[in-house]
Amino acid sequence: MSEKYIVTWDMLQIHARKLASRLMPSEQWKGIIAVSRGGLVPGALLARELGIRHVDTVCISSYDHDNQRELKVLKRAEGDGEGFIVIDDLVDTGGTAVAIREMYPKAHFVTIFAKPAGRPLVDDYVVDIPQDTWIEQPWDMGVVFVPPISGR
């Protein structure tokens, strides 16, 4: 990855509200399925904005065996996804997205960020990200003191 894209908490909330506005009216949804772990925070933000109380998770772990990504489903929400929003923070190469589509073929799959390789796999997203860019999410960063340039 050659570039970094830093996401602040404020930016994330703005993007989540924009996505939520596209998902109105909220009464059409039975609930939200958040993809753990990246979709947990965006899922909470969508649940708040849409007034949705039914929130479930699908937990997928990816392993790298000899440069081949293997996905393992640790926990899944029941059903085929009909009437549900499935949310993840990002669609990148599409590996996780393909698994999600297979598990929940009738769900409305959304992300906050989308890279070109994964874009065709989601129903909606907010921010285009170049394929070779690494996203730093706010939950993966800590706030640290940065001394003034002058050193005084």
From Swiss-Prot:
One of its GO terms (molecular function) is identical protein binding. Keywords: Cell inner membrane, Cell membrane, Glycosyltransferase, Magnesium, Membrane, Metal-binding, Purine salvage, Transferase. Its cofactor is Mg(2+). It is found in: Cell inner membrane. 5-phospho-alpha-D-ribose 1-diphosphate binds at R37, G38, R69, D88, D89, L90, V91, D92, T93, G94, G95, T96. Its EC number is 2.4.2.-, 2.4.2.22. Mg(2+) binds at D89. Belongs to the purine/pyrimidine phosphoribosyltransferase family. XGPT subfamily. Homotetramer. Purine salvage pathway enzyme that catalyzes the transfer of the ribosyl-5-phosphate group from 5-phospho-alpha-D-ribose 1-diphosphate (PRPP) to the N9 position of the 6-oxopurines guanine and xanthine to form the corresponding ribonucleotides GMP (guanosine 5'-monophosphate) and XMP (xanthosine 5'-monophosphate), with the release of PPi. To a lesser extent, also acts on hypoxanthine. Does not ribophosphorylate adenine. This is Xanthine-guanine phosphoribosyltransferase. It comes from Escherichia coli (strain K12).
